[in-house]
């Protein structure tokens, strides 16, 4: 099985290092090959300061891309264009401030298998209380007893069957 991980980053070298450290701790079977593509979304190439260190300390292959248009949307599109002709089984999106549990991949693949799912998102734990907790929108009883609907799922912790990306032709998104 081949997995490609996309991490857009914008001037957060320290949290990116922690993210890569946590990915290095993921428990994997020998049959699983992982590569990481980091998309630098800063205009000043701030990532250059830690590039060599990240490569040296990672047990997985790391590739770096640059996207000058600001925003995770543009960075993820740059990634999708880069992997368009690849033969990955799954792709994953993390944010540069994600810290991944060592059992993340095992649990995500188990969920895909048990639920016959093509896309799995995981939980988010916010360490900063100022961050809006969108998960509250999914609660059935939210004080006034309204049910809120959102048209998206969190994209900072998602595993996607790559066949789906090709099937719906996500590569043609203009950025």
For the regions a language model picked out, list residue spans one by one.
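Short, well-formed alpha-helical segments that are part of the catalytic scaffolds
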Residues: 12-26
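A conserved acidic beta->alpha catalytic loop
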Residues: 22, 38-50, 98
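Short beta-strand-to-loop acidic/aromatic patch adjacent to the donor-nucleotide binding site
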Residues: 88-99
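Conserved donor NDP-sugar-binding/catalytic core segment of glycosyltransferases
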Residues: 102-133
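Short beta-strand/loop segment that forms part of the nucleotide-sugar
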Residues: 33-43, 65-66
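A recurrent flexible, glycine/aromatic-enriched loop bordering the glycosyltransferase active site
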Residues: 127, 142-160, 175
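Glycine-rich, basic loop-to-helix element that forms the pyrophosphate-binding segment
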Residues: 67-86
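Cell-envelope/extracellular polymer assembly enzymes that use nucleotide-activated donors
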Residues: 2-4, 35
């Amino acid at each position: 099985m081949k997995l490609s991980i996309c991490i857009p980053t914008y001037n957060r070298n320290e949290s990116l290092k922690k993210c890569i450290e946590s990915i290095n701790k993921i428990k994997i079977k020998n049959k699983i090959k992982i590569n990481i593509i980091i998309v630098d979304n800063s205009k000043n190439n701030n990532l250059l300061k830690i590039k060599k260190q990240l490569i040296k300390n990672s047990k997985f292959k790391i590739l770096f891309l640059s996207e000058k248009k600001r925003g995770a949307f543009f960075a993820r599109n740059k990634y999708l264009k880069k992997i368009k002709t690849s033969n990955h089984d799954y792709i994953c999106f993390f944010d540069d401030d994600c810290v991944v549990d060592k059992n993340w991949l095992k649990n995500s693949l188990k969920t895909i298998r048990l639920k016959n799912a093509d896309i799995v998102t995981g939980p988010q734990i916010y360490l900063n209380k100022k961050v809006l907790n969108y998960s509250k929108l999914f609660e059935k009883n939210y004080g006034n007893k309204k049910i809120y609907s959102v048209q998206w799922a969190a994209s900072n912790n998602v595993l996607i069957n790559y066949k789906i990306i090709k099937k719906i032709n996500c590569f043609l998104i203009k950025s």
